[in-house]
């Protein structure tokens, strides 16, 4: 096993402070090509990548996201579920393909395809010495993002990725993940609630200790509390409507 690859993946953490130095076109091409070689369901390649270095477009997307690093980075990617090219094939084909890419299964396939591509790009970027952070916040206003990026029907902006050279004072670190035993199930799912609660209790303490050590005791939030606060907030409740408008979840 390559210790380099293992350690690279284990040491991943989100970077939100970047130097102003742009990423070269040669590196962007390498990143995209590495992404393209991710696995793709049934060879559909149901994704596109929008690369953004235009400051005005970044500013417009920042208004949607609310995050400064949408502008302050070396480069910005937006990952798009894309069946537009498939719809063009459908227009010229004797087969009726539309049900497939307008179905819930089509949504899952396109989302998974785009995510695998993005993770290949993320790992490659980190191997090049760049830092990165995902931007789910672009879904705060899907309609506006579609307008800014001029996305046609049968496409959907899933998330973004800001990347670049980390600032010298960037001091992020990997957050503790759930224990191996809690996420890995041998042969069958272990749904024993007592066991799950016991593991979560220990993990909550680990996360609380992590935050405390990072903030000199100012933050001691547990993982369970963080999850409860986030998932009880009513956010992006228009997502099904936006998917329908884009031509998805019709079946």
Curated annotation (Swiss-Prot):
**Cofactors that this protein relies on:** FMN
Enzyme nomenclature, EC number: 1.6.-.-
Q: Which range is the signal sequence, renumbered to this chain? A: none
Per the UniProt record, one Pfam family is Nitroreductase
A GO molecular function held by the record: oxidoreductase activity
Q: Which Gene3D superfamilies match?
A: NADH Oxidase
Keywords (A to Z) from UniProt: Flavoprotein, FMN, NADP, Oxidoreductase
- Family that this chain belongs to: Belongs to the flavin oxidoreductase frp family.
Q: What functional role does this protein have?
A: Reduces FMN, organic nitro compounds and disulfide DTNB. Involved in maintenance of the cellular redox state and the disulfide stress response.
Q: What is this protein called?
A: NADPH-dependent oxidoreductase
